[in-house]
Amino acid sequence: MVQILHISDTHLGKRQYSLVEREKDIYDIFSQLVDIAIKEHVDVIIHSGDLFDVSSPTTNALVMAIKILKRLKDVNIPFLSIPGDHDTPKRKGYLIPHNILSELDLIKILNYEKPYIIKGIEVYGIPHIPTVSKSILVSALSALRPKSSRSILLLHQGVKQILPYDGSWQMELGSLPKGFGYYALGHIHTRWRLTQDDGSVIAIAGSPDIMREEEIEGYEKFGKGAYLIDFSKDLPILSTINITVRPQKVVTINTKNIKKDILTIRDDLIEHNKSENNKPILHIIVEGERMRKDLLYKELLPLNDVALYYRIYKDETTQTVDNLSYTLPRDKGLDKIIIEYLTKYEKFSEDEANLILQMIKNVESDEIVNEILKKLTGVNL
């Protein structure tokens, strides 16, 4: 029996919304995947790119990667990978972070010139090739000739049929070379799989955690985790491995019923947190009439102790203005014009307007801006 764990887009070191907790989540998810590999006695792990979130990962990210990968080495499970776009330096002459792990004999970096052989299965890999170099990708793909269907190809590219936006894809499914039994794709964060007429499988493992809010819908439909591949015969048989991640939710509030909406969300989260250890992240859509941001954030304060983090994801409020016109006076300086506009039309007090003016003048100083925002909203940033 030959078992392979296919994972991708782990983005080690990513600190979503600058939250230390999210960086720890990412390491924990990677560790869980290694736990699964060891428990299932897999013969190899294949990783389809974006092992790290950036091409120059922090010391923390490197140390955690080394610690976790050492556990695989201790039980003789090889870790095969290709660099993704996040792993790849944008300047020539710089090494990918994988080289450090390779020097420590913790991973094998795949290429398309010579396969890695594991129990008779050929494993090829093509590193991420950017859109401007599509011709290089096409050439590399056309040169591949596996000996049999007991073969795997790792890629980290945008695929037109899945990402049909200008500049987001570098290849089409029809460009995949014939003859492989399993095509292990990365780059796209939502799971996807297709069994072709010849029995071969094209599979996107997806990211094992929710890296962006647009992944929430896909997570709710398909889950997050990995694919466990049984390659004992000529063609692969896939099983879906799901893992538990910190929940992220898109919620909607209306400024007309803002207190009621927020309390409803709060009550739901209190109930959720009774059975879950991980407080969720909220992506808030605001509807209704326009509301001053400082007042809006004050209304959101009841969510502070039930959510790890919340943000205004979409502001879909509208402003009703009756015959509003504003002529810039010629006898006043810019400061006075700004103060007058903020107090007369935005209904700020004069003190608040002065604070906003100071924030505008010191926009390049995060420290000053954050201090002023604290005064305006009463929220620690």
From Swiss-Prot:
* Keyword rRNA processing in annotation: no
Its Enzyme Commission number(s) read 3.1.-.-
Cofactor(s) needed? Mn(2+)
Keyword set, alphabetical order: DNA damage, DNA repair, Endonuclease, Exonuclease, Hydrolase, Manganese, Metal-binding, Nuclease
| Gene Ontology process terms (BP) | DNA repair; double-strand break repair
Gene3D superfamilies (UniProt xref): 3.60.21.10
Q: Which residues bind Mn(2+) 2?
A: D50, D85, H156, H187
Cofactor note text: Binds 2 manganese ions per subunit.
- UniProt activity-regulation remark: Nuclease activity is regulated by Rad50.
Highest taxon in the source lineage: Archaea
Q: Does the keyword Hydrolase apply?
A: yes
Q: Which InterPro entries match?
A: Calcineurin-like_PHP_ApaH, DNA_Repair-Maintenance_Comp, DSB_Repair_Mre11/Rad50, Metallo-depent_PP-like, Mre11_archaea-type, Mre11_N
A molecular function annotated in GO for this UniProt entry is: DNA end binding
Active site per UniProt = H86
The residues listed in the UniProt record as binding Mn(2+) 1, with positions renumbered to this chain, are D9, H11, D50, H189
Q: Which Pfam families match?
A: Metallophos (PF00149)
Q: Which family does it belong to?
A: Belongs to the MRE11/RAD32 family.
Q: How does it assemble?
A: Homodimer. Forms a heterotetramer composed of two Mre11 subunits and two Rad50 subunits.
What is this protein's function per UniProt? Part of the Rad50/Mre11 complex, which is involved in the early steps of DNA double-strand break (DSB) repair. The complex may facilitate opening of the processed DNA ends to aid in the recruitment of HerA and NurA. Mre11 binds to DSB ends and has both double-stranded 3'-5' exonuclease activity and single-stranded endonuclease activity.
What name does UniProt use for this protein? DNA double-strand break repair protein Mre11
Q: Which organism is it from?
A: Saccharolobus solfataricus (strain ATCC 35092 / DSM 1617 / JCM 11322 / P2) (Sulfolobus solfataricus)
